[in-house]
Amino acid sequence: MSTSAVCALLVAAPLVLPTAAVAETAGAPLELEAKIPLGAVSGRIDHLAVDLKRQQFFVAELGNDSLGVVNLAAHRTRSTLPGLKEPQGIGYEPSTDVVYVANAGDGSVRLLWAEDLTSKRRIELGADADNVRIDNARNRVLVGYGKGALAVIDPKSGAKVADIPLKAHPESFQIDESTGRAFVNVPDAGEITVVDLAKGEAIGTFPTKGHRANFPMALDSEAQRLLVVFRSPPRLLVLSSQDGAVIADVDTCGDADDVFVDPKRHRVYVSCGAGVVDVFEERAGSYQRIDRIPTVSSARTSLFVPDLDRLFVAVRASPGEPAGIWVFRPAP
């Protein structure tokens, strides 16, 4: 099938920011560099994934039932693929050059060739396929789904080879390739589950200290710390990834859906549906919020790409603001 048959091409040009918009974040730890329009995209936007080889990233346009492809070098939308069912999680697997798109609406995982988004395979998980992670060390793709499991997919065959059972539906999870463990947010069970990937089973839990709705998660592998953001109350909890000991517990913005570590600057970025990105700085084991960067209400998903040294925030369409990706440059 040709590219034109599956992709509706867009001509959205990069938006030149007015001086006032640039000045609003000038001197801040995150400076707004560009706004990339996504075209006629309505509703909620979920997660993002990057393809560094082609300098492009993929956008799960959940409310639009589509997948967007953005050219990072040109700061413009390249194409969009319609016909999905509430896409949530995305992962790019470089060894096979395949994009994995997890759909909440029908529980499927669509495997698409990254070059032109033509279909390679479809895996039926049954319900609520969600976050996607690439396990490079074990050459596997993991997808959280249903009432409580991580599906394990072999990228060479494109087939599901195992399930790792959990107590309830998994939200964000991270893989520690150095230890062969995964840490999984399971909010309906009120816990963070520790998984042994070689055994394919849960081996323990970390405390949540009475906090609820743990959705975003990041792993600071170098410092051996796990960063988890809760929505009720809105808190950033920092744990030792070795034993779950609490290192920090600080207030953050509401309705968070993504958190990232900037190892170069010892910072943490939390994107929130409250319409802000919280910026924390780590100093001698303590975490202090140094700024709160305004975005747009419901702009709660984001992607920090260390190789590009940029934070990309997904902004859904609203009165006065079209759907787009806001590009922030960390400073200094």
Range-by-range predicted roles:
Residues P18-P332:
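Predominantly soluble domains enriched in secretory-pathway, periplasmic, or organellar proteins
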